[in-house]
């Protein structure tokens, strides 16, 4: 049985059509960049500090921490859903380092923050925070796992979101052609947009876990790739603030030899 275009995205049956101007816009390559910007709009940072508990102690996670985590994840060049783990890891690293500096700095050596904590202390804090529901909630709020229908639905029904994603790309008239009421059915010309959004989002990362016979080899490979991406990210960082630009990656040092 031959499938029509409206049946070619899993879980979506599109039968409605668009106006000719909307079809023309949706069929243009301009939509690739617009979808990219639409996805980036979901990658947010805290507007103000949020208090969580670290090792049983109240601790403030700052907007700067989430900003640096976002910069690291974006610079990895990974699809949005795969880059979420990098955002998570970097945010935990930021929290651990700041907390260690707060409670583990020798007053006689203030230029060496966290000196009083051992490597084991750092490892325990990192593991606890990676599994912390409060940290996971921050990750979900600022770098959620997304689906293609979410991206396209919000893009085409939220004027402000569409205007921001298409800034300098589409005219006001073009925006008007694309906008539709919330809960409108997907149209046949939406299917290529859904495909593009799915491509840019990528698959969600696998949960980190060990099998009965030991560590999951595939997960180890993915973690190693994530580590390389993080190192490369520091070399090609889309700097979120000036402090990020001071990072010297081990990748750079290795590459220089």
Task: Write out the residue ranges for each language-model feature.
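P-loop NTPase Walker
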Residues: 1-38
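Conserved helicase NTPase catalytic core signature
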Residues: 64-257
């Amino acid at each position: 049985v031959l499938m029509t275009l409206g049946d070619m995205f899993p879980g979506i049956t599109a039968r409605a059509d668009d106006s000719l101007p909307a079809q023309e816009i949706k069929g243009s390559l301009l939509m690739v960049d617009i979808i990219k910007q639409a996805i980036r709009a979901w990658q947010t940072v805290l507007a103000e500090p949020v208090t969580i508990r670290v090792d049983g102690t109240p601790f403030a996670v700052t907007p700067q921490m989430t900003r640096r985590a976002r910069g690291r994840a974006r610079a990895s060049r990974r699809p949005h859903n795969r880059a979420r783990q990098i955002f998570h890891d970097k945010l935990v690293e930021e929290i651990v380092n700041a907390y260690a500096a707060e409670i583990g700095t020798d007053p006689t050596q203030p230029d060496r923050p966290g000196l009083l904590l051992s490597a084991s202390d750092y490892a325990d804090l990192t593991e606890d925070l990676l599994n912390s529901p409060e940290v996971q909630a921050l990750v979900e709020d600022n770098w959620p796992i997304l689906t293609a229908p979410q991206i396209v639905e919000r893009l085409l029904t939220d004027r402000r979101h569409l205007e921001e994603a298409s800034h300098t790309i589409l005219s006001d008239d073009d925006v008007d052609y694309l906008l539709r009421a919330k809960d409108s059915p997907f149209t046949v010309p939406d299917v290529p947009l859904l495909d593009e959004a799915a491509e840019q989002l990528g698959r969600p990362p696998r949960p980190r876990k060990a099998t009965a016979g030991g560590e999951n080899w595939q997960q180890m490979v993915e973690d190693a790739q994530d580590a390389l991406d993080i190192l490369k990210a520091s070399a090609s960082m889309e700097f979120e603030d000036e402090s990020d630009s001071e990072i010297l990656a081990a990748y750079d040092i290795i590459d220089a030899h």
